[in-house]
Amino acid sequence: MSVCLVTGGAGFIGSHVVDALVSRGDSVRIVDDLSTGSRTNVRTSSKVEFVQADLAEPGVASIAVDGVEWVVHLAAIPSVPRSVRDPARTHRANVEGTQALLLASRDANVRRVVQASSSSIYGESETLPKHEGMQPSPLSPYALHKLIAEQYASLYTRLYGLETVSLRFFNVFGPRQSPGSQYSGVISLFTA
């Protein structure tokens, strides 16, 4: 089967992606700086390699993609409030880390990069349902970072032929979610 890199693979969403890939027989390399993820989310398996590192650090992305066929890029600081408090730090993680990963993927001839984006790029538009043709209107550094990452991915497809897909997640919740997440209590609100 394939060798896949999952950035942010110790996080809430990433750890579930790793589980699914391993269950289907793929080998997985996880790169996570554990700033928002937890090592306890990572299953122990001979098919899983864990590397604790920051993608924005020089050389890390090149090492991360070495020998992989495709990438699921979930590493980020996924917090609007944190991006408002510390826009430089979140820009480094969400934009510079993504750009480094795309460049390294291009250089390593990775087949495809699938990356997480966010519905936050739509801003406060009341139009429903949301769709990809809508005009982005980011209202926070986090939303802008995700839009920039999408644009970088599209640019790498056009300029270099690197296959990229950006997925705009909406309020994801479930097992392994941090209890401190602003969405962790959403089910109780929906069922009340």
Range-by-range predicted roles:
Residues L103, S188-A192:
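Generic alpha-helical structural context detector
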Residues M1-V172:
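N-terminal Rossmann-like NAD(P)+-binding domain of SDR-like oxidoreductases, especially those catalyzing
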Residues L147, V172-S188:
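Glycine/proline-rich active-site loop of Rossmann-fold NAD(P)-dependent oxidoreductases
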